[in-house]
Structures are given as C-alpha cells and as structure tokens.
C-alpha cells in the first residue's frame, strides 16, 4: 500500500491547471495519505500558458516551478525527481486527463513494486478526428490501456507517463540526459530497468490521452524522434522495430535502393500523410525510409 506520493508533471506550452485540480481533489480525499503535486515548466515560450498555470500555486500542496531554459524530457523529469520529497513518485504528462475518479486510490491500493505503470487510453471512433494521423496511429496500435497486453512485454511497452516509481530507484537510474530532443528516452529507460532487474508491474489504471497535434506537426515530431533513434541506435538495438527492419534491409543489400528512392517518394508520401486521408501503411514506410535516409546524411557516425 502506498501512503505517500509526489505527483510530478513536466509541461511545455500546455495549460494543465484542470489536470492538477482533478488530481488534487482525488489526493485530498484519500485517508492516511500524504501528497504533493509539482509541475515543472520546461521553459515555455507561450506566456499566456504560463500565466494560466500560475494558478496552480493557489492549490493546496501544489507548486508550479518555472524554468527559464527548455532542456528536454529527460532533464525535466530528473529535476522533478530531485525536487520531490516523498518515497513514491507518480509521473504524468501535462496533456493527459483523468478518466477515473479512483485513479489515485487504485495506485494507493496496488501492491508495492519498484515501478508500476497504469497505461493510457484513447477514445475510439471520434468522427472529428478521422483525418488526424496521430489519432489514427494510436487507434491502430495496441491499445496501451490493455494491461494484459502490456504485461506480456513489460519493458518494451513502457512509457514515462502515468507510472509510479520509488524515488530511490529514479535517483539511482535517472533518465539519460543526452536525450535533448524528442523521442526514445523512455525506451532506453525501460532497457535500463530491465538490465538492473527492476520489475515493472502493469496494471489497469489508464489516464486519457486526447491531445492530437496536426498532421504536419506529428510528421515533423516523428522525424525528430527518428533522428534521436539514429543517434542512439547502438544502445537501442533490440528495442526498436525500425532498427530491426533497417538491419534486415541492409543484409538483403536493399539499403542503397531505399536511399535512392527516398528523394523521389518522400514528397508525395509526406503530402498524403499531412493531408486529409493519411495512411498508417505509408506512415510506417516513410519512417523506415527516413531512418535509412539518415545514413546517407550522417554515415556511420552519430549525429
């Protein structure tokens, strides 16, 4: 049973006041339970967002921390872990929402484990989002809210949001701060936990995810994450299907063909992905070709 908790929310250009209010209400109603909610702003450039989030400081046991410089997902999470005062940490992304009034109680009553992951859930069949690539991508994939599927691959299906971890473990094995740009810091963290024999318990306690950026932005963020993957490809071997498929293409002596095709096919595929009829099949093809294309730019050395 978990009776103390530091709820840690990193944010960047996102208003998360309602999320904090929902969590604060739940925490305040739990018996024999000590808590704090820390929100760390990673150098937001949207001043109106910062202004709205300042109201978090008016809530009991809540604190909004402004940081001047954007330092990335790994640094901000490690910072929050150091700022926290309780034995247990709950990390939540600021663009998630509470969908269960017993969310914190479920964690409180869970059997203790080094890491506990609750997953996330996307509401399906939203007509207004049928042209949104990120939404389609989430719906086509394995639903992260299904804890039984996640438990079958406990380290591979782990994300650094909506998870509880002992503070001592987080401080001993912090996120790798070389990850300055978007993507894959959670994958390497899962690998670190596995290598150090730290168990992850997957439970049915999802948060909602309903923040679906536009198609162009999503493709751009995907490209950024693939550059991160390429940079850390040696350490992420065995933890990325893209690396696995790219290695097979190289063994089949098809890499040069893919590199030559990318300049020809990338623009029409990207136009389809950013339009009103995006295709997950083409999205997967684009990701693989873009990753292989990075070898043309950077060669055998890291970025």
Write out the residue ranges for each language-model feature.
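Short, flexible, basic/aromatic active-site loop/helix in glycosyltransferases
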Residues: 119, 135-155
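Acidic donor-binding loop at a coil-to-helix junction in glycosyltransferase catalytic cores
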Residues: 181-189
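Active-site donor/metal-binding and catalytic loop motifs
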Residues: 196-233
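Glycine-rich, basic loop-to-helix element that forms the pyrophosphate-binding segment
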Residues: 67-84
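Short aromatic/hydrophobic "clamp" motif used to bind/position activated sugar donors
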Residues: 89
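Acidic donor-binding segment of Leloir-type glycosyltransferases
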Residues: 23-66
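Conserved donor NDP-sugar-binding/catalytic core segment of glycosyltransferases
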Residues: 101-132
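Non-catalytic, C-terminal membrane-associated alpha-helical segments of glycosyltransferases
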Residues: 224-227, 241-303
């Amino acid at each position: 049973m978990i009776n103390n908790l530091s709820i840690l929310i990193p944010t960047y250009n996102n208003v998360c006041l309602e999320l904090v209010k929902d969590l604060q209400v739940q925490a305040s109603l739990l018996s024999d339970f000590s808590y704090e909610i820390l929100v760390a702003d990673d150098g937001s450039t949207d001043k109106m967002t910062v202004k709205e989030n300042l109201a978090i400081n008016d809530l009991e046991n809540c604190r909004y921390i402004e940081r001047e410089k954007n330092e990335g997902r790994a640094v901000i999470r490690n910072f929050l872990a150091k700022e926290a005062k309780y034995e247990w940490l709950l990390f939540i992304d600021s663009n998630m929402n509470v969908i269960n009034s017993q969310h914190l109680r479920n964690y409180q009553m869970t059997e203790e484990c080094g890491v506990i992951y609750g997953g996330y859930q996307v509401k399906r069949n939203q007509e207004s989002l049928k042209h949104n690539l990120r939404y389609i991508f989430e719906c086509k994939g394995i639903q992260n809210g299904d804890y039984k599927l996640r438990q079958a691959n406990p380290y591979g299906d782990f994300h650094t949001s909506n998870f509880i971890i002992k503070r001592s473990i987080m401080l001993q094995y912090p996120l790798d701060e070389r990850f300055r740009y978007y993507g894959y810091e959670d994958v390497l963290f899962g690998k670190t936990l596995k290598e150090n024999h730290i168990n992850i318990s997957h439970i049915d306690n999802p948060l909602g995810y309903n923040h679906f950026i536009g198609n162009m932005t999503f493709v751009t963020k995907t490209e950024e994450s693939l550059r991160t993957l390429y940079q850390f490809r040696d350490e992420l071997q065995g933890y990325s299907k893209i690396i696995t498929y790219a290695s097979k293409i190289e063994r089949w002596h098809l890499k040069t063909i893919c590199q030559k095709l990318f300049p020809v096919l990338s623009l029409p595929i990207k136009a389809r992905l950013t339009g009103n009829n995006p295709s997950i099949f083409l999205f997967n093809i684009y990701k693989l070709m873009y990753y292989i294309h990075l070898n043309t730019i950077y060669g055998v050395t890291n970025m």
